[in-house]
């Protein structure tokens, strides 16, 4: 995914319009595949629905799309951009300084959004493949659901397997394909609507409210659990803000919304005209003339794949942001594309694949998957509402208006949550379990970092300048390396981690010409790349603070190369003679990076709760990327030293010397 140019963020263009269709609307754009089917099946089948039920259902869909997607997300949430980036973690970075507890809705919302990303590919791809059941020449094959499952799993395997290569050139086709998809939704829906044009009366919210309290509605208020399926992609719309820009979303959303609504109207009209059709039919595919069914199934499958791709890429972006905000374990990441917007995280990719395929095998049909779908995303939306309210207060919006907005959307989304909660026993428990597991991991990681920062001992580097200078000139010790670089998570002004000085002075004195201490600070701005240097009045100590945006790669060696060149040019760093080099003009000596692998010792004197957190974090750490990979040091000279996380001074255990005198009997 290419990141939008900042100068055109609020502008719209033809190219941006098409790109937005391929990136932003995959989830919400494939909802017509299964939303009406879910409504009809919960009512008892096509033969059980009435005109008032169809009008009420479409009305509820229209006004759900209007209130949640259009008003909350397109008109309000898109204003909450963090340097042109959207999504729940970008929103959190905007408001996190207002009060510490806002980490709670951020973690819950991020976890539920990630769990939703595992279910969406299963639902959309299965729904599309099930369309083959209405293709006359293939009915004898795909009436057997096992063949549908096999085809779905094959498509999902290919989809997840190609993630490591990036979307590349194929990604450029997503926009045009989705344009064709939405054009088809609108045109086919409009043509089908001519059979019963009264479906357009559904724009009146009266019909939706009437259905909620009508005895004709077999599900009562819980019908909203199916209605909500129409707007599950609204959160993804906000998350993809940085890839396409606000202007392109504002222009493309009306086109998408009209196309989707026409599709629902067309399906509703077809149902009213075909009350005697089989109850097992999906209204979306059944409403298509048989001679075009195969073409539509292919188009729907492509749209489902694109929607799934957008969710998978969005999951990588979500986790990547969480890792840089230090609220998620640092898993190994690669960048298959030519731009920073494309990230691939192998652990997350195959985790999503395992969950997605398990869901397909567990639920077997899209109808059963729909029963579990939507519960997690209602929680995400509620968490976004909380964070959004604080953002509006921060921007100076009157607290009374913010309170009204929070109450309105809180009640609305709360009702959708309660309506979806009934899905818990019908499969919703799966996504809840996934979300709870992710929340547990994020909480352990975050709390563990807080415990370490609270207990770990820091030393004042100024107190050791003399020792370091003396070591540089001590002829009793051989030169360890010309430049020794320590990467540290903790450096506050002149205070550095005690374990670093222990490594230099106590383990085996490391004699060097220059000692570098590098600390990375992740900024709230996504694409910051700045640094600050303090040499503490010497020419042999260099403290470097790298300020990197939460979307930037933390490839320290490449940044350090630039910093060294600039320090040499300015004369702040003395030239370092180099006798042997393929570059005769090189003025820089060799570098050795020291990575301290901090290990938690169970002998540390911690409270039981803190001990549990640290033990869990140590277990999770076995699955994370090594610092060498995380900081891009694979091709540098690196030494990894195992050091204890020193919370308190470890006293020796009591022991007595055994006396050699022994008492013998007579």
From Swiss-Prot:
Pfam families: K_trans, K_trans_C
Membrane topology: Multi-pass membrane protein
Main location: membrane
One GO MF term attached to the UniProt entry: symporter activity
Recorded catalytic activity of this chain's protein: K(+)(in) + H(+)(in) = K(+)(out) + H(+)(out)
Subcellular location: Cell membrane
Signal peptide range: none
InterPro entries given in the database record: K+_transporter, K_trans_C, K_trans_N, Kup
Domain of life of the source: Bacteria
Annotated transmembrane regions: 16-36, 58-78, 99-119, 141-161, 167-187, 221-241, 253-273, 292-312, 343-363, 373-393, 402-422, 424-444
GO CC field: plasma membrane
Alphabetic keyword roster: Cell membrane, Ion transport, Membrane, Potassium, Potassium transport, Symport, Transmembrane, Transmembrane helix, Transport
Family: Belongs to the HAK/KUP transporter (TC 2.A.72) family.
Annotated function: Transport of potassium into the cell. Likely operates as a K(+):H(+) symporter.
Name of this protein: Probable potassium transport system protein Kup
Organism per entry: Streptococcus agalactiae serotype V (strain ATCC BAA-611 / 2603 V/R)
């Amino acid at each position: 995914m290419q990141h939008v140019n900042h100068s055109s963020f609020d502008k719209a263009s033809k190219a941006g319009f098409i790109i937005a269709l391929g990136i932003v609307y995959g989830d919400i754009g494939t909802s017509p595949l299964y939303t009406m089917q879910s409504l009809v099946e919960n009512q008892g089948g096509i033969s059980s629905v009435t005109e008032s039920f169809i009008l009420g259902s479409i009305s509820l869909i229209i006004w759900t799309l209007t209130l949640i997607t259009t008003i909350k997300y397109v008109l309000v949430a898109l204003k909450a951009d963090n340097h042109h980036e959207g999504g729940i973690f970008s929103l959190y970075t905007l408001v996190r300084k207002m009060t510490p507890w806002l980490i709670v809705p951020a973690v819950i919302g991020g976890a539920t959004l990630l769990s939703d990303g595992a279910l969406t590919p299963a639902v959309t791809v299965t729904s599309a493949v099930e369309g083959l059941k209405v293709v006359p020449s293939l009915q004898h094959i795909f009436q057997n659901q096992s063949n549908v499952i096999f085809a779905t799993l094959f498509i999902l395997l290919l989809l997840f397997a190609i993630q490591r290569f990036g979307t590349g050139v194929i990604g450029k086709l997503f926009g045009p394909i989705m344009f064709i998809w939405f054009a088809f939704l609108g045109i086919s829906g409009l043509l089908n609507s001519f059979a019963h044009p009264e479906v357009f009366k559904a724009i009146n919210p009266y019909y939706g409210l009437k259905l909620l309290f009508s005895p004709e509605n077999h599900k009562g208020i819980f019908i909203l659990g199916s209605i909500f399926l129409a707007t599950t992609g609204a959160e993804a719309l906000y998350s993809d803000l940085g890839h396409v820009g606000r202007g392109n979303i504002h222009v493309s959303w009306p086109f998408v919304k009209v196309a989707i609504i026409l599709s629902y109207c067309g399906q509703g009209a077809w149902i009213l005209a075909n009350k005697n059709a089989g109850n097992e039919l999906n209204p979306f595919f059944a409403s298509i003339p048989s001679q075009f069914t195969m073409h539509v199934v292919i188009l729907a499958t492509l749209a489902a794949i694109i929607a799934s791709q957008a969710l998978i890429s969005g999951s990588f972006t979500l986790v990547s942001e969480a890792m840089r905000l230090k609220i998620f374990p640092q898993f190994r990441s690669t960048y298959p594309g030519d731009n920073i917007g494309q990230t691939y995280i192998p652990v997350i990719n195959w985790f999503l694949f395992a969950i997605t395929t398990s869901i397909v095998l567990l639920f077997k049909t899209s109808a059963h998957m729909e029963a579990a779908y939507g519960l997690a995303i209602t929680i995400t939306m509620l968490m976004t509402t909380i964070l959004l309210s604080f953002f509006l207060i921060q921007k100076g919006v009157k607290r009374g208006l913010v309170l009204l907005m929070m109450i309105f959307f809180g009640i609305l989304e709360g009702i959708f949550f309660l309506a979806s909660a009934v899905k818990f026993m019908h499969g919703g428990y799966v996504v809840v379990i996934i979300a709870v597991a992710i929340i547990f991991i994020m909480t352990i990681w975050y709390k563990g970092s807080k415990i370490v920062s609270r207990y770990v001992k820091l030393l004042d580097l100024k107190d050791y300048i003399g020792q370091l200078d003396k070591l540089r000139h001590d002829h009793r010790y051989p030169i360890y390396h010309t430049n020794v670089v320590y990467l540290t998570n903790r450096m506050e002004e002149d205070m550095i981690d005690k374990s670093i000085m222990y490594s230099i002075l106590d383990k085996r004195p490391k004699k060097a010409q220059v000692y570098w201490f590098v600390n990375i600070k992740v900024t709230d701005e996504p694409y910051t790349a700045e640094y600050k240097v303090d040499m503490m009045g010497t020419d042999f100590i260099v403290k470097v603070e790298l300020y990197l945006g939460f979307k930037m790669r933390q490839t320290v060696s490449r940044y350090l190369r630039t910093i060294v060149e600039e320090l040499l040019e300015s004369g702040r760093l003395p030239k370092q003679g180099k006798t042997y080099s393929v570059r005769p003009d090189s003025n820089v000596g060799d570098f050795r990076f020291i990575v301290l692998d901090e290990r938690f010792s169970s002998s540390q004197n911690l409270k039981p709760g803190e001990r549990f957190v640290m033990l869990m974090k140590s277990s999770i750490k076995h699955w994370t990327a090594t610092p060498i990979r995380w900081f891009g040091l694979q091709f540098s000279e690196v030494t990894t030293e195992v050091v204890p996380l020193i919370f308190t001074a470890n006293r020796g255990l009591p022991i007595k010397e055994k006396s050699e005198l022994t008492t013998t009997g007579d």
